[in-house]
C-alpha cells in the first residue's frame, strides 16, 4: 500500500503506488462524469483546442467569431503566459476573476478522454504548473486583491479538478511526480476555501461549501477528508433553509443565483 511505502520514506515509490491506486479506484462513483462512453460537444472541443495555443476560454468573453466558432483571447506574451492580461476594451472585473477559474481545463480533459491525444494533458500540465508557480497557495486569510485565491475562484477550481483528474489519470504523462504536485495543490485549494468562507449567506458561500463537501465525498483518501465532509455537510444543512426567503425565492433576489444555488444543492445530493 502507498501508506506503508510512505512510512519507510520511499516517497517516489509511495507516489507510484498512489498513482496505481487512483488508476484502479473502483469504490468511488463520481456521478458528474462518464468515462465509459465519453462525449464532447463541439463547443467544448473548440475550447480545448484553442487552449493548446494559450487562447483560454473565459466565460462570457470572446475576442471574435470566426467560421461559426468563438475565438478567445490569447494570453501569450514574450513566449510566456501573461496571467495578468486583460484586453484593453474590457473594463469588467469579471474577466480577471473568471480567468482564474480555469474554465478551459475540464474541456481539455474531456477532449483527452474522447480523442486519447496526449497533447491535451501535456497542455494542461504545462499551463497548470505555470499557474501554480506564479500563484503559490496563500496561508490564512486572503485579501480581495488576491483575486486568484478569493471567493468563487478556488471553489470552482476544486469542483472542476475532481472531474478533471479521472479523465487524465490513465495517461502516461500523468506521472507519480505530477500526481504528487496535483494532490498537494488540491489539498491547498480546499484548505484555502475553508480559511476564507464568505459569511454573507450568498450564492458564493454555497459554492464554497459545495466544493468542500464534494472534496470530502469524492476524495476521501486525504487525511482531512473527514473534516471536509463533516464541516461541509453541517453548513449545507444550515444553508438549505438560510438561502431562501419564506416565499421560496433565493435571498439575493436574482433568478440566476436562485438556479445556481438549487443546482449546487442538487449536485451534492447526486
Residue spans for each PLM region:
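Aromatic-lined, polymer-binding surfaces characteristic
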Residues: 79-80, 85-270
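Generic alpha-helix initiation/capping and coil-helix boundary signal
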Residues: 8, 41-44, 208-209, 225
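Short, small-residue-biased leader/transition segments that mark boundaries at the very start
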Residues: 2-6
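Membrane-proximal, glycine/serine-rich, low-complexity loop/turn segments characteristic
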Residues: 10, 18-21, 28
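Helix-centric, low-specificity signal for extended rod-like, repetitive segments
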Residues: 16-18, 48, 94, 150
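Short, solvent-exposed helix-helix connector turns and helix-capping sites enriched
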Residues: 7-11, 54, 117
Amino acid at each position: 500500500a502507498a501508506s506503508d511505502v510512505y512510512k519507510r520514506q520511499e516517497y517516489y515509490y509511495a507516489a507510484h503506488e498512489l498513482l496505481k491506486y487512483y488508476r484502479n479506484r473502483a469504490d468511488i462513483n463520481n456521478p458528474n462524469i462518464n468515462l465509459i462512453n465519453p462525449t464532447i460537444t463541439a463547443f467544448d472541443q473548440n475550447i480545448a483546442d484553442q487552449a493548446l495555443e494559450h487562447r483560454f476560454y473565459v466565460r462570457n468573453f470572446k475576442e471574435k467569431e470566426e467560421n461559426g466558432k468563438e475565438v478567445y483571447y490569447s494570453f501569450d506574451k514574450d513566449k510566456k503566459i501573461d496571467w495578468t492580461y486583460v484586453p484593453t476594451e474590457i473594463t469588467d472585473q469579471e474577466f480577471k476573476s473568471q480567468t482564474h477559474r480555469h474554465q478551459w481545463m475540464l474541456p481539455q480533459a474531456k477532449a483527452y478522454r474522447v480523442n486519447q491525444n496526449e497533447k491535451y494533458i501535456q497542455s494542461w500540465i504545462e499551463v497548470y504548473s505555470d499557474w501554480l508557480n506564479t500563484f503559490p497557495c496563500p496561508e490564512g486569510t486572503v485579501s480581495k486583491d488576491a483575486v486568484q485565491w478569493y471567493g468563487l475562484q478556488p471553489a470552482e477550481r476544486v469542483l472542476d479538478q475532481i472531474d478533471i483528474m479521472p479523465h487524465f489519470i490513465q495517461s502516461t504523462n500523468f506521472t507519480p511526480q505530477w500526481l504528487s504536485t496535483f494532490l498537494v495543490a488540491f489539498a491547498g485549494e480546499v484548505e484555502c476555501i475553508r480559511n476564507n468562507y464568505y459569511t454573507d449567506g450568498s450564492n458564493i458561500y454555497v459554492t464554497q461549501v459545495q466544493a468542500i463537501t464534494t472534496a470530502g465525498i469524492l476524495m476521501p483518501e486525504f487525511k482531512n477528508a473527514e473534516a471536509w465532509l463533516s464541516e461541509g455537510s453541517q453548513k449545507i444543512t444550515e444553508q438549505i433553509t438560510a438561502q431562501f426567503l419564506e416565499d421560496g425565492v433565493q435571498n439575493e433576489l436574482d433568478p440566476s443565483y436562485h438556479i445556481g444555488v438549487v443546482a449546487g444543492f442538487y449536485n451534492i445530493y447526486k
